[in-house]
Amino acid sequence: MKRNILAFMAVMLMLCMSAQTSQAQLKRFSIGPYVEAGFPTGDFSTTHNPGFGVGLGADVKLIAGLTAVGSVGFDYFKGKTIDNGNTKIASAKVIPVRLGLRYQLISILYVKVEGGTANFTGDYNNGTGALVAPGLGIRLLGLDVEGKYEAWFKDGTHGFFGLKAGYNF
């Protein structure tokens, strides 16, 4: 029994020591939550109010300055009542799944382009469409703030300007 406990303690000690030395190395992978605000444009702005979203993003460093990024989230845009209060548009509830690339321009400034699917749920435009989302942002330590334009393509274009803030671990 003592031998098992000593062996376990030795393994734990080695893991702790290796974790301390690996913290000095650069992280190649990070993951973290984000929140975003969306401001509809075009026809989407006539039928929906500004919305919000939450989600989880991840990134993997590839080569100098280039990073693969991905995220999954939930966006909500409340529908408007139009035509003198006679027509109520259903709220847009969307689950976007994005994959893309981020390129570091200078130390904290980056450009990013993402593509993927927009899964509409609920009564508004139910089904799956494509999405594209170019953006410009800053990343300082774990804090990530991005301005972007995102367009969902299903039965027309549903576009919005967004402000996204997240923290990566």
Which residues does each predicted region cover?
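Cleavable N-terminal export/targeting peptides
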Residues: M1-R28
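Short glycine/proline- and aromatic-enriched beta-strand/turn motifs that initiate or cap beta-hairpins
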Residues: Q20-L62, W152, F160, K164-N168
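Outer-membrane beta-barrel channels and translocator barrels
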Residues: L26, K61-G65, I106-I108, L140-L143
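Residues that define the transmembrane beta-barrel architecture of outer-membrane proteins
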Residues: K27-F29, H48-F52, S91-V97, N126-V132, ...
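Transmembrane beta-strands of outer-membrane beta-barrel pores
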Residues: V35-D43, F52, V72-K78, K93, ...
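Outer-membrane beta-barrel domain signature
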Residues: T41-T47, D59, D83-A90, F120-N125, ...
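Structural signature of outer-membrane beta-barrel channels/translocons
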Residues: D59-K61, R102-Q104, G137-L141, G166-N168
